[in-house]
Regions:
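Short amphipathic alpha-helical segments with coiled-coil-like heptad repeat character
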Residues: 3, 82-83, 142
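Short, well-ordered surface patches within globular domains
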Residues: 39-101
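Generic alpha-helix initiation/capping and coil-helix boundary signal
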Residues: 14-17, 21-22, 67, 71, ...
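Secretory targeting and sorting signals
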Residues: 1-38
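Short, charge-rich amphipathic segments
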Residues: 9, 58-73, 142, 165-171
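A well-ordered secondary-structure block
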Residues: 97-171
């Protein structure tokens, strides 16, 4: 059996390497666990990209543009649905509909929306699109070539994720 010299340079630096590794893992875990109200930009952009793909497959020739007003309307409704457990669709806790919220956000065109509610902390854009794709009413909204603008927002808590997409036809 060979005995290792605990004072050799390779073993003296081991504890600092181990501590650095553990510290990095701990820091990574803290960075990954973003606050519930964080801007889920990558998720939202993924939804926009996937809706654009569906529109393209439906034969739509215009590019989908992100509208700040529609994004704001989507944000308001996503927060409302997240914080009011009895909501799971288009009507807000104040009785507002998607057109009301879009108008309040400064959008004057015709709008529709799709809403996804998931009973977990995390949701991804493919789960959202799959949910909407297989609902005939939502698929019709996503593939409607007249809807040339979009705003997407998602929010999550420890036990609920909500994603809202508001689609617009400019006035």
């Amino acid at each position: 059996m060979r005995v290792r010299d605990l004072t050799s340079p390779s073993t003296r630096t081991l504890p600092s390497r181990v501590l650095l590794g553990v510290g990095s893992i701990t820091l990574s875990a803290l960075v990954v666990a973003a606050p519930a109200n964080a801007d889920n930009q990558r998720l939202n952009n993924g939804v926009v990209t996937n809706v654009g793909t569906i529109k393209s497959q439906a034969g739509c020739s215009t590019n989908l543009k992100v509208s700040p007003q529609l994004r704001l309307a989507a944000e308001w409704h996503a927060n409302d649905v997240l914080n009011n457990r009895n909501l799971d669709g288009d009507i807000g806790s104040d009785g507002s509909g998607v057109q009301d919220r879009a108008r309040a956000a400064g959008y004057t065109g015709v709008v529709t929306e799709t809403v996804a509610v998931h009973p977990a902390f995390a949701i991804n854009d493919l789960d959202i699109i799959s949910n909407w794709y297989y609902r005939p009413d939502y698929f019709a909204i996503m593939s409607n070539c007249a809807n040339t603008e979009i705003g997407v927002w998602s929010e999550n808590s420890l036990d609920r994720s909500v994603a809202v997409a508001v689609y617009g036809q400019p006035a």
